[in-house]
């Protein structure tokens, strides 16, 4: 039987609430907790619009960029962002825009480029010979839990391994498609998919509902 679902939903909010919440956090006028609370409220509104569907997308929401989200999910964080104080969210925004709340802890932001032929710009993944991956699926697992607690059937949506490698760039003389990066990346995605399959079975969703882009 056919199931009705989509690949994602706009995340900025009907009145650009996310944009204003981001700016408030970066300027120090609001807290991390307030930003995350607003993000959760936007997700709930989005899911409410989709509640008539058989499956609702999770993982489509982002505080800045979905490709950057996948880099952090894989632990592929530029070395220049690893040695600063603050939490994961602060490092996330440093990679995205050069700095987070503390302007003294600034770095070079990641390169931005167009997502294929669209006007959407994503943060380009970086690869080096020393690049290592460390899986952290908590972001999407938390969103799956949120959707499940609302009585919805979640469908994880992520950037797939081939796409992730293809749109990234080498920052040294390494080759992103050599066996070193290729194997490590696919191992992480296999683990990620196993986690999602396990979760989706727990909420009575067929394995085929898992989608990668």
What are these regions (language model features)?
Residues 1-213:
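Domain-level signal for soluble alpha/beta catalytic cores
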């Amino acid at each position: 039987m056919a199931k009705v679902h989509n690949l994602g939903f706009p995340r900025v909010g009907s009145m650009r609430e996310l944009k204003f919440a981001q700016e408030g956090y970066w300027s120090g006028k609001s807290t991390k907790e307030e930003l995350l609370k607003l993000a959760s409220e936007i997700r709930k509104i989005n899911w409410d619009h989709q509640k008539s569907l058989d499956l609702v997308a999770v993982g489509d929401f982002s505080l800045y960029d979905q490709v950057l989200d996948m880099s952090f999910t894989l632990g592929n964080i530029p070395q220049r962002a690893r040695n600063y104080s603050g939490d994961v969210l602060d490092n996330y925004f440093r990679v995205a825009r050069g700095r987070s709340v503390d302007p003294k802890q600034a770095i070079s932001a990641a390169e931005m480029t167009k997502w294929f032929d669209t006007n959407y710009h994503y943060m380009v993944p970086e690869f080096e010979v020393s690049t290592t991956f460390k899986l952290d699926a908590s972001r999407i697992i938390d969103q799956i839990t949120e959707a499940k607690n609302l009585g919805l059937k979640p469908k994880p949506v992520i950037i797939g391994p081939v796409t992730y490698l293809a749109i990234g760039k080498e920052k040294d003389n390494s080759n992103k498609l050599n066996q070193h990066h290729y194997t490590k990346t696919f191992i992480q995605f296999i683990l990620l998919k196993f986690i999602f399959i396990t979760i989706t079975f727990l909420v009575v969703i067929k394995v085929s509902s898992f989608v990668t882009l």
